[in-house]
Amino acid sequence: MDFNKENINMVDAKKAKKTVVATGIGNAMEWFDFGVYAYTTAYIGANFFSPVENADIRQMLTFAALAIAFLLRPIGGVVFGIIGDKYGRKVVLTSTIILMAFSTLTIGLLPSYDQIGLWAPILLLLARVLQGFSTGGEYAGAMTYVAESSPDKRRNSLGSGLEIGTLSGYIAASIMIAVLTFFLTDEQMASFGWRIPFLLGLFLGLFGLYLRRKLEESPVFENDVATQPERDNINFLQIIRFYYKDIFVCFVAVVFFNVTNYMVTAYLPTYLEQVIKLDATTTSVLITCVMAIMIPLALMFGKLADKIGEKKVFLIGTGGLTLFSIIAFMLLHSQSFVVIVIGIFILGFFLSTYEATMPGSLPTMFYSHIRYRTLSVTFNISVSIFGGTTPLVATWLVTKTGDPLAPAYYLTAISVIGFLVITFLHLSTAGKSLKGSYPNVDNEQDRAYYAEHPKEALWWVKERKN
């Protein structure tokens, strides 16, 4: 491949920060919806699965509706990934946030089982399916867009900003549920209170749409289209054949990230209420505080990843959860409130290492012309099988074994696998150009350096297979 120094991408760091805000709103929307659903599962179950008398089974059905929707995420990933690689990242990101806002609003408007019978859970499932389909193109698109718009040397620190949206969305959901449960009686929450957050989610979606319409296309995508007008026509089977190792590493990384993520954000509130017997308000406050602490932690680990490499930060997370998952869950059973808080914080601390590094690292595993679709499909298949099913699996493990520490064993096993895969198969890409692209720089000094060192600028050429 002939090197042309004029193709080195000069990006504006300030504009990159605005990009993080606009894309982070979509993450906030996704996790606001998910957080509200997780916190209101008891009310949703009572409204849509009221004929089921057993509370545990009703809870599992409510989580199952969530898990089934995750099966649509890979389909959304395929559709939006192909569109994103062909027509650009921006068009997908503006579409997905509209669909997410609509599905969230729909859940808040649905009649209950007592009003329309079996149609109630069917419509609930369809709303979750639409949510799953749209989010199939959302997060991978946001990661890709931010990675392609950021200076290479700051990719992880800026990427970690995406998770501010994720955590903020969940915090907003937690605060809203805490406020509602404080001012409304349980009967009022079951009747109409649980619907309020879903209805308000519409405004968050509209705000995100407003910001995203102002985005420009990512400089990497524009540069690649300009320099490679006849982009490689490669199908998914060829992608798997050429890049199976990268796909496998990405798949495993998404597994240990999302099992931990959904364990803490989706399952832990239910665990604290049903197993530990904390009240809903206390649970909401605890989770909210831990999420708030995770925001500066994620930003800190993002900066650290740019300095020492994301691989080492990955290993801090997987190694830490291998050693401390069981201990953290044991602390949750303490009679001391402070000790319970420490147990939750341990889980949140190590989760923040993933929140910091995944957005800036996963897009680097794939070449530009296949990045969106490959990341989107790999990410969503992994999330569908392991992430979205985590609350259901954890609930089933506790019910089946009678051991309240069963979720910790599951988390430990996943962390061990992640630690081994990252140790032996992952190549750190912090500070390097994205595969298939020229470097992204934000100053003339870096631009001049890469102009004089083309092999470092295009380090990926020697391993490209198509």
Curated annotation (Swiss-Prot):
One of its GO terms (molecular function) is symporter activity. Coiled coil: none annotated. Pfam families: MFS_1. Keywords: Cell membrane, Membrane, Symport, Transmembrane, Transmembrane helix, Transport. The keyword Nucleotide-binding does not apply. One of its GO terms (cellular component) is plasma membrane. The chain crosses the membrane at residues 20-42, 63-83, 91-111, 116-136, 164-184, 191-211, 247-267, 285-305, 313-332, 337-354, 377-397, 405-425. CDD domains: MFS_ProP. InterPro entries: H+-coupled_symporters, MFS, MFS_dom, MFS_trans_sf, Sugar_transporter_CS. It is a multi-pass membrane protein. It is found in: Cell membrane. May be a proton symporter involved in the uptake of osmolytes such as proline and glycine betaine. PANTHER family: ALPHA-KETOGLUTARATE PERMEASE. Belongs to the major facilitator superfamily. Metabolite:H+ Symporter (MHS) family (TC 2.A.1.6) family. This is Putative proline/betaine transporter. It comes from Staphylococcus aureus (strain COL).
